[in-house]
């Protein structure tokens, strides 16, 4: 079942769902909007082959910057970048979050691959952004993502306790 604005407010009021900071315009009709933070990471086109079984070195594969909210960050045509949300989101054991880009940004040609926030997860959300056919400037603080919460039929037996639990900022891959 997809939660309505009233359901989301109830979960937050009871302390079961945490979104921090929670602004007045965060809760929408059937989900929440999350804002872009100021950190963006570009993939380094000159990086060597990435071996997914070896430790990942962020400095080799990404060029990360903190951007001024007034200057923004330009996503180049068809470029893939990583970003993160300003908000920390903590889900209880009976909610799953389905993340998508807000339709305004989709209409600009921006794409975000489907992302799931697992039941029991707590942290900022790292997302991949794929650029449009033309450069698009994004700004920290913009409501960029929409998260729809789905209630599971029963609380999950094994809430998320994985390698990304508690992540802050843009979090690179952590090989198994």
From Swiss-Prot:
InterPro entries for the chain: dCTP_deaminase (IPR011962), dUTPase-like_sf (IPR036157), dUTPase_trimeric (IPR033704)
Gene3D superfamilies, per the entry: 2.70.40.10
Keyword rRNA processing carried by entry: no
EC number(s) per entry: 3.5.4.13
Active site: 128
Similarity comment: Belongs to the dCTP deaminase family.
Name the UniProt record assigns to this protein: dCTP deaminase
Organism: Hyperthermus butylicus (strain DSM 5456 / JCM 9403 / PLM1-5)
């Amino acid at each position: 079942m997809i939660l309505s604005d009233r359901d989301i407010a109830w979960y937050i009021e009871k302390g079961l769902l945490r979104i921090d900071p929670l602004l007045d315009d965060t809760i929408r009709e059937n989900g929440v909007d999350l804002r872009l933070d100021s950190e963006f990471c570009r993939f380094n086109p000159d990086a060597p082959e990435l071996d997914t079984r070896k430790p990942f070195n962020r400095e080799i594969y990404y060029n990360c910057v903190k951007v001024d909210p007034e200057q923004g960050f330009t996503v180049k045509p068809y470029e893939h970048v990583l970003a993160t949300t300003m908000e920390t989101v903590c889900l209880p054991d009976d909610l799953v979050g389905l993340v998508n880009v807000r339709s305004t940004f989709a209409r600009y040609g921006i794409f975000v691959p489907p992302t799931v926030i697992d039941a029991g997860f707590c942290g900022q959300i790292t997302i991949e952004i794929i650029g449009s056919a033309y450069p698009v400037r994004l700004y920290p603080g913009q409501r960029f993502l929409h998260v729809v919460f789905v209630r599971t039929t029963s609380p999950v037996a094994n809430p998320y306790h994985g390698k990304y639990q508690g992540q802050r900022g843009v979090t690179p891959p952590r090989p198994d």
